[in-house]
Each structure stands twice: as structure tokens, then as C-alpha cells.
């Protein structure tokens, strides 16, 4: 059995690493666009900078809170590993789809839309899970 199915913390770490990799790739794409357009700070009014900047920024805006929700659920002993994967899979897939959709299309995009819906699903699962954890009577730790 894979270690990803043995521990909520290992599964959480896996999704942190995957989402850090996504952010790194998006950051490299911004740097590449800066080199190509000779842009130092911001977008310098160059429209070709808008999509890579927004793809990176959008990921940086949405991913941390979802990972924090996941961490809140991964740390208590006995939290279902399915809950961690129920947040991690849609979050990671959603962030990838959104970045591809935003990077490849200036206008509306089905991939971008699907990515946001999956990200919202991850948020909803995480929010409900944390509320359940907080408001459900737990047995005291021994």
C-alpha cells in the first residue's frame, strides 16, 4: 500500500509538494515572459505579461487557504485520509486546469472554469470538514 494511503500527514505533504511545484512552474513561466518582453516589475503595460502574471497570482491567492484547511484536518489523529484526498485531488487538478486555461486563452475558457469549480469543491470539502471537526464531539486524547 502506498504511503499516501497510510497517513493523513503524508498525503497532506504530497499535496503541498505538488502544489508548490505548480507554483514554481508558474513562477518560471512569469520569469520567462519577463525575459522575452524585457519587463522588470509588474507588467510595464505589456499585454503579453498579463496572463502569466495572473496565472501565477491566482494560484498564489487560492492555494494557501486550501492547504491550511487540509493541514487543519490532517493533524488530528483519526481524521479520514479520504477527506485529505477529497481536498487534495480537486485542488491540485483544479489549479493545473485553471493555469492551463488562463495561460492558453485570453478570453473565457472551459479549462479555466473547470479549474475554478474544482478549486471551489476543494474549499467546500475543507470548510465542511473543519466545521465538522470543530463542532462534532471528539473523545478526549489519552
Regions found by a protein language model. Name each.
Residues 128-142:
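Juxtamembrane boundary at the C-terminal end of a transmembrane helix
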Amino acid at each position: 500500500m502506498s504511503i499516501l494511503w497510510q497517513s493523513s500527514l503524508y498525503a497532506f505533504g504530497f499535496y503541498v509538494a505538488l502544489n508548490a511545484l505548480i507554483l514554481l512552474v508558474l513562477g518560471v513561466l512569469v520569469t520567462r515572459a519577463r525575459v522575452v518582453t524585457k519587463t522588470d516589475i509588474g507588467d510595464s503595460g505589456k499585454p503579453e505579461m498579463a496572463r502569466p502574471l495572473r496565472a501565477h497570482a491566482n494560484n498564489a491567492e487560492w492555494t494557501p487557504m486550501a492547504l491550511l484547511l487540509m493541514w487543519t484536518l490532517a493533524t488530528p489523529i483519526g481524521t479520514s485520509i479520504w477527506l485529505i484526498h477529497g481536498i487534495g485531488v480537486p485542488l491540485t487538478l483544479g489549479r493545473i486546469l485553471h493555469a492551463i486555461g488562463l495561460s492558453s486563452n485570453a478570453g473565457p475558457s472551459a479549462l479555466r472554469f473547470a479549474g475554478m469549480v474544482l478549486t471551489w469543491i476543494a474549499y467546500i470539502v475543507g470548510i465542511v470538514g473543519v466545521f465538522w471537526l470543530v463542532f462534532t464531539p471528539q473523545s478526549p486524547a489519552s
